[in-house]
Regions:
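C-terminal beta-strand-loop-alpha-helix "lid" module of Rossmann-like NAD(P)-dependent dehydrogenases
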Residues: 1-284
Length: 284
């Protein structure tokens, strides 16, 4: 049985840990709100660009050709795997890694290229023998548009050089702080819907072709940026949930240790009283 001194040390240690997990929960909660706000602010912009592109892709643009719209036989795929830089986020990192490995399962290493965003997917995939062509890190919980642009530029270069035939982004979609879903989204080639109903007509300056040439890469960048924001919110939501659980568990452990400590003290006091009474009786 542990001594009273040992129990006091354990209670102090668990209390210190609880303070740390509580602080981490509060930080994750504040950052989660900011990430959600950014994602919500980005959505209308992305939706509007998508709407214009869908309208234009169904228009008669004589002579317009773009490799970004060119569907070709898929022999090699570029995977952009988005994950976390840090741990202590529950099953967030393991879930996205598991999903990514499922996408690569059974495929020869010469049929895919991998770009990672986040230290966790980079290190985990390297440890499993996956060659990483390019890695980005240091911004998983606070991505910027420039990060998305750099990632998309790397993938686009591979695609335009015909080193890959499609680009797929693997990231975690944020539902709420308790639910995050790993998923894959094809970025290239850009899909052209066949049944889009024509709506409002647009006037383009200087021309529809030049506007489309400018919008296509922007659309890809904003799509990657949205994926980074979704992943950031998912990471922070998972971390907040994990730290909430850790804080609650620490509280329960402190209560249990406190009860054990009080019982030990009560037993010690009872023994001391018994010894005093026994000594007094012996002197009579």
């Amino acid at each position: 049985m542990a001594s009273a001194q040992d129990l006091r040390k354990r209670i102090k240690s668990v209390t210190n840990t609880q303070q740390i997990t509580k602080a981490m929960k509060m930080v994750a909660s504040a950052r989660l709100r900011r990430a959600q706000t950014k994602a919500e602010a980005t959505r209308p912009y992305a939706e509007k660009i998508g709407q214009i592109l869908r309208h234009m892709s169904n228009s008669d643009l004589e002579g317009f050709e773009s490799p970004l719209l060119d569907v070709r036989p898929v022999e090699r795929t570029c995977y952009i795997v988005v994950g976390a830089d840090k741990g202590l986020a529950g099953a967030f990192s393991s879930n996205v890694l598991k999903f990514a490995m499922e996408q690569l399962h059974g495929k020869s290493s010469d049929t895919y290229r991998v770009i990672t965003a986040g230290r966790k997917p980079r290190d985990s995939m390297k440890s499993r023998g996956i060659r990483i062509d390019k890695s980005y890190a240091g911004f998983s919980d606070k991505p910027s548009y420039e990060h998305a642009r750099a990632i998309m530029h790397e993938a686009l270069s591979l695609y335009e050089r015909h080193e890959v035939d499609e680009v797929i982004m693997i990231y975690t979609r944020f539902v709420n702080s308790m639910t995050q879903i790993a998923q894959a989204e094809r970025l290239l080639p850009i899909e052209q819907p066949q049944d889009e109903v024509k709506g409002q007509e647009y006037d383009f300056m200087p021309s529809a072709v030049s506007v489309l040439e400018a919008l296509l890469p922007k659309y890809l960048e904003i799509t990657v940026y949205n994926g980074l924001l979704q992943s950031a919110a998912s990471e922070l939501g998972a971390r907040m949930t994990a730290m909430t659980s850790a804080t609650d568990n620490a509280g329960e452990l402190i209560e249990s240790l406190g009860l054990e400590y009080n019982k030990l003290r009560q037993s010690s006091i009872t023994n001391e009283i018994s010894e005093i009474v026994g000594g007094a009786n012996a002197l009579q």
